Protein backbone atom coordinates (compact mmCIF):
# COMPACT_ATOMS: atom_id res chain seq x y z
CA UNK A 1 0.00 0.00 0.00
CA UNK A 2 1.25 3.44 -0.92
CA UNK A 3 1.00 6.56 1.20
CA UNK A 4 -0.63 8.30 -1.76
CA UNK A 5 -3.54 5.84 -1.54
CA UNK A 6 -4.65 7.79 1.54
CA UNK A 7 -4.57 11.24 -0.02
CA UNK A 8 -7.66 13.38 -0.60
CA UNK A 9 -8.34 16.97 -1.58
CA UNK A 10 -9.26 19.21 1.34
CA UNK A 11 -10.14 22.88 0.86
CA UNK A 12 -8.31 25.06 3.36
CA UNK A 13 -11.55 26.63 4.59
CA UNK A 14 -12.68 23.24 5.98
CA UNK A 15 -9.83 23.16 8.50
CA UNK A 16 -11.34 24.16 11.85
CA UNK A 17 -9.15 26.78 13.52
CA UNK A 18 -11.52 27.42 16.42
CA UNK A 19 -13.80 25.01 18.29
CA UNK A 20 -17.56 25.13 18.54
CA UNK A 21 -18.68 27.03 21.64
CA UNK A 22 -21.00 24.13 22.51
CA UNK A 23 -18.98 20.90 22.48
CA UNK A 24 -21.86 18.58 21.56
CA UNK A 25 -23.15 20.77 18.73
CA UNK A 26 -20.57 19.66 16.19
CA UNK A 27 -21.65 17.50 13.29
CA UNK A 28 -21.36 13.72 13.39
CA UNK A 29 -20.94 11.51 10.35
CA UNK A 30 -22.14 8.00 11.15
CA UNK A 31 -20.45 5.34 9.02
CA UNK A 32 -21.50 1.71 8.96
CA UNK A 33 -18.25 -0.07 8.26
CA UNK A 34 -20.03 -3.25 7.21
CA UNK A 35 -21.91 -1.78 4.25
CA UNK A 36 -20.60 1.78 3.85
CA UNK A 37 -23.91 3.48 4.71
CA UNK A 38 -23.56 7.11 5.79
CA UNK A 39 -25.86 9.17 8.00
CA UNK A 40 -25.46 12.84 8.87
CA UNK A 41 -26.13 13.68 12.51
CA UNK A 42 -25.20 15.99 15.40
CA UNK A 43 -22.74 14.79 18.04
CA UNK A 44 -25.38 14.80 20.76
CA UNK A 45 -27.01 11.95 18.79
CA UNK A 46 -24.38 9.55 20.15
CA UNK A 47 -26.82 9.13 23.02
CA UNK A 48 -29.05 7.25 20.56
CA UNK A 49 -26.18 5.28 19.00
CA UNK A 50 -24.76 3.84 22.23
CA UNK A 51 -26.73 1.14 24.05
CA UNK A 52 -27.18 0.21 27.69
CA UNK A 53 -24.31 -2.06 28.73
CA UNK A 54 -21.93 -0.78 26.06
CA UNK A 55 -18.48 0.26 27.30
CA UNK A 56 -16.95 3.61 26.38
CA UNK A 57 -13.15 3.78 26.65
CA UNK A 58 -11.77 7.31 27.11
CA UNK A 59 -8.18 8.55 27.18
CA UNK A 60 -7.79 10.66 30.33
CA UNK A 61 -4.46 12.24 29.44
CA UNK A 62 -4.24 15.98 30.06
CA UNK A 63 -2.52 18.36 27.67
CA UNK A 64 0.34 20.29 29.24
CA UNK A 65 1.24 23.82 28.08
CA UNK A 66 4.27 22.31 26.41
CA UNK A 67 5.46 25.09 24.09
CA UNK A 68 7.99 27.58 25.47
CA UNK A 69 9.84 30.46 23.85
CA UNK A 70 13.23 31.73 24.92
CA UNK A 71 16.83 32.19 23.88
CA UNK A 72 20.24 30.61 24.06
CA UNK A 73 23.02 32.24 26.06
CA UNK A 74 24.38 33.47 22.72
CA UNK A 75 21.15 35.41 22.19
CA UNK A 76 19.67 33.22 19.47
CA UNK A 77 15.93 32.67 19.73
CA UNK A 78 14.54 29.20 20.43
CA UNK A 79 11.18 27.49 20.50
CA UNK A 80 10.96 24.47 22.80
CA UNK A 81 8.21 21.85 22.56
CA UNK A 82 8.22 19.35 25.41
CA UNK A 83 7.76 15.82 24.06
CA UNK A 84 7.98 13.90 27.33
CA UNK A 85 8.50 14.73 30.99
CA UNK A 86 11.26 12.52 32.41
CA UNK A 87 10.99 13.65 36.03
CA UNK A 88 10.20 16.83 37.96
CA UNK A 89 13.10 18.73 36.39
CA UNK A 90 14.10 16.93 33.18
CA UNK A 91 12.31 16.59 29.87
CA UNK A 92 12.78 15.58 26.25
CA UNK A 93 11.95 18.28 23.74
CA UNK A 94 12.01 19.37 20.14
CA UNK A 95 14.01 22.61 19.84
CA UNK A 96 13.73 24.99 16.91
CA UNK A 97 16.53 27.49 16.45
CA UNK A 98 18.88 28.75 13.77
CA UNK A 99 21.57 26.43 15.18
CA UNK A 100 20.93 23.44 17.41
CA UNK A 101 22.16 23.94 20.99
CA UNK A 102 25.18 21.88 21.96
CA UNK A 103 25.54 19.74 25.05
CA UNK A 104 25.99 21.98 28.08
CA UNK A 105 24.39 25.01 26.40
CA UNK A 106 22.39 27.28 28.69
CA UNK A 107 18.82 28.12 27.72
CA UNK A 108 16.62 30.88 29.10
CA UNK A 109 12.94 30.02 28.83
CA UNK A 110 9.78 32.07 29.05
CA UNK A 111 11.13 35.55 28.40
CA UNK A 112 8.05 36.31 26.27
CA UNK A 113 6.03 36.13 29.50
CA UNK A 114 8.57 36.95 32.21
CA UNK A 115 10.43 39.73 30.43
CA UNK A 116 13.88 40.06 28.93
CA UNK A 117 16.69 38.66 31.11
CA UNK A 118 14.13 37.08 33.46
CA UNK A 119 13.87 33.70 31.74
CA UNK A 120 14.00 30.43 33.62
CA UNK A 121 17.43 28.87 33.24
CA UNK A 122 17.85 25.36 31.83
CA UNK A 123 20.72 23.30 30.43
CA UNK A 124 20.82 21.07 27.37
CA UNK A 125 22.20 17.82 28.78
CA UNK A 126 22.20 15.44 25.82
CA UNK A 127 20.77 14.75 22.40
CA UNK A 128 18.75 11.64 21.56
CA UNK A 129 18.16 11.64 17.81
CA UNK A 130 15.75 14.47 17.03
CA UNK A 131 15.07 15.13 20.72
CA UNK A 132 17.02 17.17 23.25
CA UNK A 133 17.27 16.26 26.93
CA UNK A 134 16.89 19.46 28.96
CA UNK A 135 17.18 19.99 32.72
CA UNK A 136 15.93 22.94 34.75
CA UNK A 137 18.74 24.56 36.71
CA UNK A 138 16.57 25.58 39.66
CA UNK A 139 15.47 22.40 41.45
CA UNK A 140 13.12 24.24 43.79
CA UNK A 141 10.38 24.48 41.14
CA UNK A 142 8.78 21.48 39.43
CA UNK A 143 8.58 21.28 35.65
CA UNK A 144 4.77 21.26 35.62
CA UNK A 145 4.71 24.48 37.63
CA UNK A 146 7.18 26.06 35.21
CA UNK A 147 5.02 25.06 32.25
CA UNK A 148 1.91 26.47 33.90
CA UNK A 149 3.75 29.77 34.33
CA UNK A 150 5.50 30.21 30.98
CA UNK A 151 4.14 27.52 28.66
CA UNK A 152 1.73 27.87 25.75
CA UNK A 153 -0.89 25.33 24.69
CA UNK A 154 0.72 23.30 21.88
CA UNK A 155 -1.88 23.78 19.18
CA UNK A 156 -1.30 21.62 16.09
CA UNK A 157 0.53 23.33 13.20
CA UNK A 158 -2.50 23.20 10.88
CA UNK A 159 -4.54 25.42 13.23
CA UNK A 160 -2.08 28.08 12.12
CA UNK A 161 -2.59 30.70 14.81
CA UNK A 162 -1.10 31.58 18.20
CA UNK A 163 -2.71 29.94 21.20
CA UNK A 164 -5.28 32.02 23.08
CA UNK A 165 -6.51 31.93 26.66
CA UNK A 166 -9.66 30.05 25.63
CA UNK A 167 -7.55 27.18 24.26
CA UNK A 168 -6.50 26.28 27.81
CA UNK A 169 -10.04 24.96 28.31
CA UNK A 170 -11.18 24.20 24.76
CA UNK A 171 -8.13 22.08 23.87
CA UNK A 172 -8.74 19.84 26.89
CA UNK A 173 -11.31 17.08 27.43
CA UNK A 174 -13.67 17.64 30.37
CA UNK A 175 -12.45 14.37 31.92
CA UNK A 176 -8.71 14.94 31.46
CA UNK A 177 -6.80 13.95 34.57
CA UNK A 178 -3.20 12.80 34.02
CA UNK A 179 -0.81 15.53 32.75
CA UNK A 180 1.58 14.51 30.02
CA UNK A 181 0.15 14.95 26.51
CA UNK A 182 1.38 17.55 24.03
CA UNK A 183 -1.66 17.06 21.80
CA UNK A 184 -5.26 16.48 22.79
CA UNK A 185 -7.11 13.19 22.22
CA UNK A 186 -9.49 15.21 20.12
CA UNK A 187 -12.45 12.83 19.76
CA UNK A 188 -13.07 13.41 23.45
CA UNK A 189 -13.39 17.17 23.02
CA UNK A 190 -17.00 16.70 21.89
CA UNK A 191 -18.22 15.32 25.22
CA UNK A 192 -19.51 17.71 27.87
CA UNK A 193 -20.55 16.92 31.45
CA UNK A 194 -24.23 16.87 30.55
CA UNK A 195 -23.80 14.29 27.78
CA UNK A 196 -21.65 12.12 30.05
CA UNK A 197 -24.34 12.19 32.73
CA UNK A 198 -27.03 11.23 30.20
CA UNK A 199 -24.93 8.30 28.99
CA UNK A 200 -24.41 7.12 32.58
CA UNK A 201 -28.14 7.40 33.26
CA UNK A 202 -28.78 5.22 30.21
CA UNK A 203 -26.58 2.48 31.66
CA UNK A 204 -23.52 3.03 29.50
CA UNK A 205 -20.28 2.06 31.25
CA UNK A 206 -17.09 4.16 31.27
CA UNK A 207 -13.43 3.22 31.66
CA UNK A 208 -10.28 5.29 31.21
CA UNK A 209 -6.89 4.50 29.72
CA UNK A 210 -3.94 6.87 29.56
CA UNK A 211 -1.90 7.53 26.43
CA UNK A 212 0.24 10.65 26.49
CA UNK A 213 -0.07 11.92 22.92
CA UNK A 214 3.28 13.08 21.57
CA UNK A 215 4.15 15.62 18.91
CA UNK A 216 5.01 12.71 16.65
CA UNK A 217 1.30 12.30 15.98
CA UNK A 218 1.64 15.22 13.53
CA UNK A 219 4.72 13.86 11.75
CA UNK A 220 4.13 12.91 8.11
CA UNK A 221 4.76 9.41 6.81
CA UNK A 222 8.05 9.80 4.95
CA UNK A 223 8.15 6.45 3.12
CA UNK A 224 6.13 5.54 0.04
CA UNK A 225 5.31 1.99 1.14
CA UNK A 226 3.36 2.30 4.40
CA UNK A 227 4.58 -1.09 5.66
CA UNK A 228 8.03 0.50 5.93
CA UNK A 229 6.84 3.25 8.28
CA UNK A 230 8.10 3.18 11.88
CA UNK A 231 5.70 4.70 14.41
CA UNK A 232 6.83 7.02 17.19
CA UNK A 233 6.53 5.64 20.73
CA UNK A 234 4.02 6.93 23.28
CA UNK A 235 3.47 5.89 26.89
CA UNK A 236 0.31 3.89 27.65
CA UNK A 237 -1.46 2.70 30.79
CA UNK A 238 -4.24 0.10 30.62
CA UNK A 239 -5.25 -1.05 34.11
CA UNK A 240 -6.59 -4.38 35.35
CA UNK A 241 -9.91 -2.62 35.97
CA UNK A 242 -10.14 -1.66 32.31
CA UNK A 243 -9.30 -5.21 31.24
CA UNK A 244 -11.95 -6.67 33.54
CA UNK A 245 -14.57 -4.28 32.16
CA UNK A 246 -13.70 -5.17 28.57
CA UNK A 247 -13.91 -8.91 29.26
CA UNK A 248 -17.26 -8.49 31.06
CA UNK A 249 -18.63 -6.38 28.21
CA UNK A 250 -17.67 -8.97 25.62
CA UNK A 251 -19.16 -11.80 27.67
CA UNK A 252 -22.43 -9.85 27.92
CA UNK A 253 -22.57 -9.48 24.14
CA UNK A 254 -22.20 -5.70 24.32
CA UNK A 255 -19.84 -3.37 22.45
CA UNK A 256 -16.50 -1.82 23.32
CA UNK A 257 -16.52 1.72 21.91
CA UNK A 258 -13.21 3.57 21.73
CA UNK A 259 -13.29 7.35 22.01
CA UNK A 260 -10.44 8.34 19.73
CA UNK A 261 -7.59 6.63 17.95
CA UNK A 262 -5.42 6.91 21.07
CA UNK A 263 -7.91 4.77 23.00
CA UNK A 264 -7.86 2.26 20.13
CA UNK A 265 -4.07 2.10 20.13
CA UNK A 266 -3.99 1.72 23.92
CA UNK A 267 -6.49 -1.13 24.06
CA UNK A 268 -5.18 -2.94 21.01
CA UNK A 269 -1.61 -2.66 22.33
CA UNK A 270 -2.70 -4.39 25.54
CA UNK A 271 -4.54 -7.09 23.61
CA UNK A 272 -1.61 -7.64 21.23
CA UNK A 273 0.78 -7.90 24.17
CA UNK A 274 -1.46 -10.53 25.79
CA UNK A 275 -1.56 -12.49 22.53
CA UNK A 276 2.21 -12.38 22.18
CA UNK A 277 2.48 -13.86 25.69
CA UNK A 278 0.18 -16.75 24.79
CA UNK A 279 -3.23 -15.38 25.78
CA UNK A 280 -4.98 -14.69 22.45
CA UNK A 281 -8.48 -14.50 23.95
CA UNK A 282 -7.60 -12.06 26.71
CA UNK A 283 -6.51 -8.51 27.30
CA UNK A 284 -4.00 -7.90 30.06
CA UNK A 285 -2.79 -4.77 31.89
CA UNK A 286 -0.26 -2.75 29.96
CA UNK A 287 2.09 -0.10 31.35
CA UNK A 288 4.69 0.64 28.72
CA UNK A 289 5.47 2.50 25.52
CA UNK A 290 3.61 1.53 22.38
CA UNK A 291 4.54 2.08 18.77
CA UNK A 292 1.66 0.05 17.37
CA UNK A 293 0.86 0.96 13.76
CA UNK A 294 -2.59 -0.09 12.55
CA UNK A 295 -3.25 0.04 8.81
CA UNK A 296 -5.47 -1.92 6.39
CA UNK A 297 -4.87 -5.62 6.82
CA UNK A 298 -4.26 -5.40 10.56
CA UNK A 299 -6.95 -6.90 12.77
CA UNK A 300 -8.74 -5.38 15.74
CA UNK A 301 -8.90 -7.71 18.73
CA UNK A 302 -11.13 -5.66 21.05
CA UNK A 303 -12.73 -2.50 19.64
CA UNK A 304 -16.20 -2.74 18.07
CA UNK A 305 -16.98 0.94 17.40
CA UNK A 306 -14.89 4.07 17.08
CA UNK A 307 -15.61 7.74 17.70
CA UNK A 308 -13.00 9.87 15.97
CA UNK A 309 -12.37 13.19 14.25
CA UNK A 310 -11.49 13.68 10.58
CA UNK A 311 -7.77 13.23 10.03
CA UNK A 312 -5.03 14.58 7.78
CA UNK A 313 -4.49 13.17 4.29
CA UNK A 314 -1.79 10.48 4.19
CA UNK A 315 -1.63 10.31 8.00
CA UNK A 316 -1.29 7.17 10.12
CA UNK A 317 -4.65 8.06 11.66
CA UNK A 318 -6.62 7.88 8.41
CA UNK A 319 -4.83 4.57 7.81
CA UNK A 320 -6.11 3.32 11.18
CA UNK A 321 -9.66 4.39 10.31
CA UNK A 322 -9.34 2.65 6.94
CA UNK A 323 -8.30 -0.54 8.71
CA UNK A 324 -11.35 -0.25 10.95
CA UNK A 325 -14.09 0.70 8.47
CA UNK A 326 -12.55 -0.52 5.23
CA UNK A 327 -10.46 1.55 2.85
CA UNK A 328 -13.16 2.20 0.26
CA UNK A 329 -15.77 3.01 2.91
CA UNK A 330 -13.40 5.42 4.65
CA UNK A 331 -12.29 7.30 1.55
CA UNK A 332 -15.88 7.53 0.35
CA UNK A 333 -16.96 8.90 3.74
CA UNK A 334 -14.21 11.53 3.60
CA UNK A 335 -15.33 12.49 0.09
CA UNK A 336 -18.86 12.95 1.43
CA UNK A 337 -17.56 14.95 4.39
CA UNK A 338 -15.73 17.37 2.10
CA UNK A 339 -18.78 17.70 -0.14
CA UNK A 340 -21.03 18.39 2.87
CA UNK A 341 -18.47 20.85 4.29
CA UNK A 342 -17.70 19.08 7.53
CA UNK A 343 -15.01 20.73 9.66
CA UNK A 344 -11.72 18.85 9.79
CA UNK A 345 -8.97 18.01 12.29
CA UNK A 346 -8.58 18.73 16.02
CA UNK A 347 -11.28 21.39 16.45
CA UNK A 348 -13.49 19.88 13.75
CA UNK A 349 -16.41 17.47 13.49
CA UNK A 350 -16.56 13.77 14.35
CA UNK A 351 -17.39 10.29 13.06
CA UNK A 352 -19.10 7.31 14.69
CA UNK A 353 -17.97 4.10 13.00
CA UNK A 354 -19.09 0.49 13.29
CA UNK A 355 -16.25 -1.93 12.55
CA UNK A 356 -15.99 -3.79 9.26
CA UNK A 357 -15.03 -7.26 10.46
CA UNK A 358 -14.22 -8.62 6.99
CA UNK A 359 -11.94 -5.96 5.56
CA UNK A 360 -8.65 -6.95 3.94
CA UNK A 361 -6.13 -4.54 2.47
CA UNK A 362 -7.47 -1.82 0.19
CA UNK A 363 -11.08 -2.99 0.22
Curated annotation (Swiss-Prot):
What Enzyme Commission number(s) does the record list for this chain? 2.4.99.17
Which EC main class describes this enzyme? transferase
- Annotated GO biological process: queuosine biosynthetic process; tRNA wobble guanine modification
Q: Which reaction does it catalyse?
A: 7-aminomethyl-7-carbaguanosine(34) in tRNA + S-adenosyl-L-methionine = epoxyqueuosine(34) in tRNA + adenine + L-methionine + 2 H(+)
Record carries keyword Cytoplasm: yes
The pathway to which it is assigned is: tRNA modification; tRNA-queuosine biosynthesis
Checking InterPro entries in the record gives: QueA, QueA_dom1, QueA_dom2, QueA_sf
What keywords are annotated for this sequence in UniProt? Cytoplasm, Queuosine biosynthesis, S-adenosyl-L-methionine, Transferase
* Entry GO CC: cytoplasm
Against Pfam families, the record matches this protein to: Queuosine_synth (PF02547)
State its location(s). Cytoplasm
- Quaternary assembly: Monomer.
Q: Which family does it belong to?
A: Belongs to the QueA family.
Briefly, what is this protein's role? Transfers and isomerizes the ribose moiety from AdoMet to the 7-aminomethyl group of 7-deazaguanine (preQ1-tRNA) to give epoxyqueuosine (oQ-tRNA).
**Name assigned to this protein:** S-adenosylmethionine:tRNA ribosyltransferase-isomerase
Organism encoding this protein: Haemophilus influenzae (strain ATCC 51907 / DSM 11121 / KW20 / Rd)
Q: What gene does this protein come from? A: queA
Amino acid sequence: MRVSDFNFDLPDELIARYPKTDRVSCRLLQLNGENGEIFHRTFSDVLDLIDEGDLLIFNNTRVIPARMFGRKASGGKIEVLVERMLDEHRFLAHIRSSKSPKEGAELFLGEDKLGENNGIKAVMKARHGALFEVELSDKSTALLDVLQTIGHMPLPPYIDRPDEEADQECYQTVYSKVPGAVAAPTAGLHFDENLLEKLKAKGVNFEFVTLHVGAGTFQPVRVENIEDHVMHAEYVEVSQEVCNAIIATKKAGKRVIAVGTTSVRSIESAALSAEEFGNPDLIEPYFSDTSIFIYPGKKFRVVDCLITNFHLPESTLIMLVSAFAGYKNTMNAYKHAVKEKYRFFSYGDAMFINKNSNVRGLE
